[in-house]
Amino acid sequence: MEPEALETCPYNPHHRIPLSRFQYHLASCRRKNPKKAKKMASCKYNACHVVPIKKLEEHEAACVNKSTMEEEDSLSPLKVSLPNAGQKGNRNASPVSPRLPNPDLWNVDSTNCHPMFVLKSFIPQKLVCESDTRESETDDHNPIPDCPRRRSSDRESEPPAEDTSLLKA
């Protein structure tokens, strides 16, 4: 088994981290070094590329992951930009050409015109426990008339008995 490639931490050059753990280490080291973190910025093409803010534009122009992001952007579904108000009067302006989706993307709907899902308001209904229903049925058909069963709902509705012995004193 080959050893995994090690990356150098931008917050502390003495830290050498395996690539598989690098994102976790960056988050941890960023929290532990807030002063240094204020001077650093993440690349928009790869969050593991953390560079000084002054060198960010230079890095993003030459970033190795830039081409990957541009390819993914070209594979995105149909995008149409509407002309702005300044272009409405200009008839010589070229028509807006929508970006067509890649035909290899079979799991994306090409029309992309689904109605927006809106959750309708929830109306709560009275919930009934099955055991309560069975208990009330057995109360109605009690085979022993000498021993009437009381439902727990009957006990809750009765007011508590008052102790009048304390009132006489």
From Swiss-Prot:
Keyword Zinc-finger included in the entry's annotation: yes
Keywords, sorted A to Z: Metal-binding, Repeat, Zinc, Zinc-finger
Membrane-spanning intervals of the chain: none
Zinc finger (CHHC U11-48K-type): 6-33, 40-67
Record's compositionally biased regions (Basic and acidic residues): 131-158
Residue positions binding Zn(2+) 2: C43, H49, H59, C63
Name of the molecule in the record: Gametocyte-specific factor 1-like
Taxonomic path: Eukaryota, Metazoa, Chordata, Craniata, Vertebrata
